[in-house]
């Protein structure tokens, strides 16, 4: 049984190929992680007679404790599935949220570093010559690492031996926690690299070198890298007899212990690299290493601001992040030199997996930079992980065939006319790096094999063409702003049954009411007490607003535009929104294993039955027609539950984002 505290018959079974990215990643969560975060002293099966009710759902003590943990795991599984289907950053958000709630705690304390990464990239990266998405990219990397672990017995063996874990499920749970930390947060330091690249791009002249341009460097970092007394005490328990004053000290020690002898560097040499990375980028080919900032920020966030318990595995995750970009390639291994030693998983399993997955994940990455938009990048990738190997077919948009054929013609002409060793070959990034092969291996594949040891895991990279996989998924005129999405969810939940909100709505003073910080604080406390399932439901309700606006011919923006401004929806628009929101609610509940029933209200969450579900429904996918028929059978009070939140969104967008809604 994959979910021992739930009715597995009510949970969707996937038809993905077992060795595909989707099939392997979801199977990792469902099958390998059985019993994830369980308290073994409480009921571990819902068929047991003596069930505790120590878990929370809509309220505390509604369900068994381990049932809550199984529901959390199903939330994560569904979030990963939604993201792999859509590739949308809105769905990537759910994966971050689930992980933070499950393994780190209180999203409120960690939200800024995730939300700002997305906002910085969207708003600042268009000034760069080259830049592509890192927000959704990190979630793809996370899923890829789950899939490789699930399908690769060789890596599983290395991981279990390294961490001295014999039980398969315990090892998978351990991997999920620390791989999630390594992968999902490996690029959070990008806001430090973006200003550096913006200055470089501003002064860029074709044919010149970076050395001739002004550059940004970071100084006065003492407060940023210093370690407070609480963190020092935690470190002393992991490394007795050692004292550390800065994060540079910690990282240099850990890396030297793991691989200093293999790669011939000392602790002092590594510390010097780390000191100079942000302060003297001119010593590192005039590039700023975001990985350094990602690891340092995360250390401070986890062990100083949040004051969580520290384990050596946390430092493994942080040093994996630290290594994944240029530190390993150019300071440790010098990976393009004759003496290069491809990195072995046995030295640092998390670092190995992060470098491998970070290199493999180059598909479906939104291009922001001016040159990046002109290049041809894969929009999808199919994987086959069978036989402990990795076969990747990178899929390019078939609509770009004219561009590809033009490149091929140029390349053939170059081959026929070139003098040996002279003339630069034509390029079409990233297609040419995967398509052109020497001795059966593309440059793209060869670079990966120089970085990580694939002598036992055979990698095969091919190219193909297909219709755009995510066509239509990013077509809304209104784009979600993650800065206030969490606050929107808090308000949507808090207004339920709130007399103050009702009075403000009747008086037309919604914006004034929502501007009261005490009200928001009260709502935030109530939101914290919800289970992960209910928090996600409110978040996804807020995210759906852009879709509903698009459906009725409206959009929101912070720009002054010559369209009719919307202060209230028409009755017909509300009916359309209500039906669409009911379909979303139904689909969400079927995905979470709910079915139709009429239990007593206080038993509803335990039995996972609801009277607003569709009677006699036996499937998992809710069509618009089925949702509409079910919506019609509901009374007015129930229908209003689907429209009231959207009217609330009108006020919230004005209050928190300074946005206005317009009708096309």
Predicted regions and their residues:
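C-terminal effector/catalytic modules and regulatory tails appended to multi-domain proteins
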Residues: 2-112, 340-346, 351, 357-360, ...
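Acidic/His-rich, divalent-metal-binding segments that scaffold phosphate/diphosphate chemistry
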Residues: 12-223, 261-268
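Active-site-adjacent bridging/hinge elements
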Residues: 106-123, 261-274, 506-524, 618-626
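Phosphate/oxyanion-binding active-site loops and adjacent basic polyanion-contact surfaces
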Residues: 130-149, 183, 286-294, 534-537, ...
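Short, well-structured alpha-helical segments
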Residues: 135, 139, 176, 180, ...
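Short helix/loop segment immediately N-terminal to the Walker
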Residues: 152-173, 308-310, 336-338, 507-515
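Divalent metal-dependent catalytic cores for phosphoryl transfer on phosphate-bearing substrates
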Residues: 169-382
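Alpha-helical propensity feature that highlights long, continuous alpha-helices across diverse contexts
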Residues: 397, 411, 421-664
């Amino acid at each position: 049984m994959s979910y021992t505290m739930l009715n597995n018959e009510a949970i969707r079974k996937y038809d993905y190929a077992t060795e595909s990215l989707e099939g392997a990643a979801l199977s990792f969560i469902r099958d390998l992680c059985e019993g994830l975060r369980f308290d073994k002293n409480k009921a571990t099966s819902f068929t047991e007679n003596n069930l505790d009710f120590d878990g929370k759902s809509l309220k505390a003590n509604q369900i068994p404790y381990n049932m809550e943990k199984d529901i959390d795991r199903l939330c994560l599984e569904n979030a990963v599935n939604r993201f792999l289907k859509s590739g949308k950053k809105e769905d990537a958000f759910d994966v971050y949220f689930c992980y933070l709630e499950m393994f780190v705690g209180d999203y409120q304390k960690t939200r800024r570093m995730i939300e700002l990464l997305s906002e910085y990239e969207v708003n600042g990266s268009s000034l760069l010559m080259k830049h592509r998405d890192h927000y959704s990219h990190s979630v793809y990397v996370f899923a890829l690492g789950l899939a490789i672990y699930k399908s690769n017995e060789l890596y599983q063996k290395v991981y279990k031996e390294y961490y001295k874990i014999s039980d398969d499920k315990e090892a998978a749970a351990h991997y999920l926690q620390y791989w999630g930390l390594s992968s999902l947060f490996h690029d959070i330091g990008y806001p430090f690299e973006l200003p550096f690249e913006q200055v470089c791009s501003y002064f860029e002249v074709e044919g010149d070198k970076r050395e001739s341009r002004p550059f940004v460097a970071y100084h006065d970092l003492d407060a940023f890298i210093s370690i407070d007394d609480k963190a020092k005490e935690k470190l002393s328990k992991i490394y007795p007899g050692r004292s550390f004053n800065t994060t540079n000290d910690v990282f240099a020690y850990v890396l030297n212990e793991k691989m200093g002898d293999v790669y011939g560097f000392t602790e002092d040499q590594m510390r010097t690299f780390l000191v100079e990375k942000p302060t003297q980028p001119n010593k590192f080919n005039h590039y700023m290493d975001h990985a350094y900032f990602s690891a340092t920020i995360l250390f401070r966030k986890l062990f100083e601001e949040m004051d969580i318990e520290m384990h050596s595995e946390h430092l493994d995750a942080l040093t994996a992040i630290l290594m994944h970009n240029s530190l390993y390639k150019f300071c440790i291994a010098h990976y393009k030199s004759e003496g290069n030693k491809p990195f072995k998983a046995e030295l640092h399993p998390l670092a190995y997996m992060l470098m491998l997955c970070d290199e493999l994940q180059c598909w479906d990455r939104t291009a922001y930079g001016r040159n990046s938009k002109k290049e041809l990048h894969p929009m999808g990738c199919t994987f086959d992980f069978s036989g402990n190997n990795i076969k990747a077919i990178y899929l390019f948009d078939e609509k770009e065939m004219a561009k590809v054929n033009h490149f091929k013609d140029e390349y053939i002409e170059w081959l026929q006319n070139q003098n040996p060793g002279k003339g630069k070959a034509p390029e079409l990034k990233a297609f040419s790096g995967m398509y052109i092969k020497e001795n059966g291996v593309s440059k793209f594949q060869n670079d990966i094999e120089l970085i990580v040891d694939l002598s036992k895991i055979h990698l095969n990279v091919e190219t193909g063409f297909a219709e755009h996989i995510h066509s239509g998924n990013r077509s809304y005129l209104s784009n979600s702003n993650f800065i206030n999405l969490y606050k929107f969810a808090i308000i949507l939940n808090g207004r339920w049954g709130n007399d103050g909100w009702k009075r403000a709505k009747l008086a037309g003073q919604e914006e004034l009411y929502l501007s009261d910080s005490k009200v928001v604080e009260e709502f935030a406390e109530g939101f914290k007490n919800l289970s992960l399932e209910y928090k996600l439901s409110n978040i996804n309700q807020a995210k759906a607003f852009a879709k509903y606006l698009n459906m009725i011919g409206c959009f929101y923006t912070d720009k002054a535009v010559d369209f009719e401004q919307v202060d209230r929806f028409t009755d017909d628009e509300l009916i359309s929104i209500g039906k669409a929101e009911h379909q979303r609610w139904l689909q969400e509940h079927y995905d979470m294993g709910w079915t139709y029933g009429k239990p007593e209200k206080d038993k509803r969450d335990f039995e996972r039955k609801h009277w607003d579900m569709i009677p006699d429904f036996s499937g998992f996918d809710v069509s618009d027609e089925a949702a509409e028929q079910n919506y019609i059978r509901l009374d007015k009070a129930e229908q209003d539950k689907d429209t009231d939140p959207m009217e609330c969104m009108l006020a919230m967008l004005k209050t928190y984002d300074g946005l206005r809604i317009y009708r096309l």
